[in-house]
Amino acid sequence: CTGHGNGIYLVDAALQSVRNAIFSADARARSYVERWTAAGIGQAVRPKTMQSLWPGQPNALLAWLRDHEPDAYARTRWVLMCKDFVRLRLTGQAAAELTDMSGTSLMDVGTAQYDPDILDRFGIGDAFDKLPPLRRSAEICGEVTPAAAAATGLAPGTPVAGGLFDVDAC
């Protein structure tokens, strides 16, 4: 499966939505990106992230949520992308797929791991524990649960793979 990249889907410890998703076209976090750019943070992390900063990325949205919706931020257990949220609903397993997270400015794409130094530079170091385990695109991340099967018509036990970031799937 694939889904749009970036934006943010937040779930709590019970795997329930914390708030409505914020899509990647949302610009509410523009001032954070402007501040980080002026301070040289974007240039400093670019060798690891290989990304330009923009307001619809999870780094900016997490900083905005921390400051403007602290209750939602505190209740968040997992930060997910669109298809990772769909996969969670199908399998009951929280995971993030590597190609999707590579566009978030939350990880070092050279090591294919989240980088706490990058998060610290954005002032969201405490979000590190909200990032789910990374999985590869073709990796089986779980199976369709009986509840998801009843809701979707899919066969229970159907394997569900990691999927691909929208741009990479094209």
Model regions and ranges:
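Ligand-binding clamshell of periplasmic/extracellular solute-binding protein-like
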Residues: 1-4, 163-167
